């Protein structure tokens, strides 16, 4: 095959690194203990779906009917992406953050969720550790600074956080968009914390949807 001929010409037998997948696996595993997420088919039960850094309609087309089925039952679909993709045009709302500002946006959302009393403390106490340190960091976030970093106004950050925490079941769907950049693992770690802090994992259709295999 062409790729083998290319590596033969370089004198190499294989690429001794991973281009993307391990970034997401390690980020999710840092939070969940394993790199797996919710079953994508369960998105049909979601009432909030954040498509974060994924042009689902083009690169994950077989999942789109599931998302449309959820919309038919009242789900709101939000695309979080620096690019105005085909999926963003079809979504209910497009949150167009600056490239590389994902962690800042998540921390801003966590600040709002904590500030407004939307943290599921019972879930955190029963199923997690270190959450108090996380929320202490989130409380120090300045939303005006977050708006400057992300290019998203404070009202939109508050809307996104409140919608995810209260319009349930709520899920985040990520694919390779966050992996093909510097600090992608940290972005995946941050996103994995969102459904834990709100207790989204309690419900079918809630959680983080990324990989279904290890």
Predicted regions: what is each one?
Residues 1-214:
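Catalytic alpha/large subunits of respiratory electron-transfer oxidoreductases
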């Amino acid at each position: 095959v062409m790729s083998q001929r290319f590596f033969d010409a370089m004198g190499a037998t294989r690429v001794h690194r991973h281009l993307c997948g391990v970034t997401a696996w390690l980020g999710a595993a840092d939070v969940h203990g394993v790199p797996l997420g919710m079953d994508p088919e369960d998105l049909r039960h979601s009432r909030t779906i954040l498509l974060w850094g994924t042009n689902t309609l083009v690169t994950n087309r077989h999942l789109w009917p599931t998302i449309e089925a959820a919309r038919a039952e009242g789900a709101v679909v939000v695309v979080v992406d620096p690019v105005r993709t085909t999926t963003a045009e079809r979504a209910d709302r497009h949150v167009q953050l600056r490239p590389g500002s994902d962690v800042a946006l998540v921390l801003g959302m966590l600040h709002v969720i904590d500030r407004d009393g939307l943290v599921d403390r019972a879930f955190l106490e029963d199923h997690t550790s270190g959450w108090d340190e996380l929320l202490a960091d989130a409380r120090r976030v300045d939303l005006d600074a977050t708006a400057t970093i992300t290019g998203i106004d404070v009202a939109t950050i508050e809307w996104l956080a409140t919608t995810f925490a209260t319009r349930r079941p709520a899920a985040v769907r990520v694919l390779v968009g966050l992996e093909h950049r510097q600090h992608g693992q940290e972005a995946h770690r941050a996103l994995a914390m969102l459904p834990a802090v709100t207790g989204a994992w309690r419900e079918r259709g809630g959680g983080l949807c990324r990989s279904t295999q290890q």
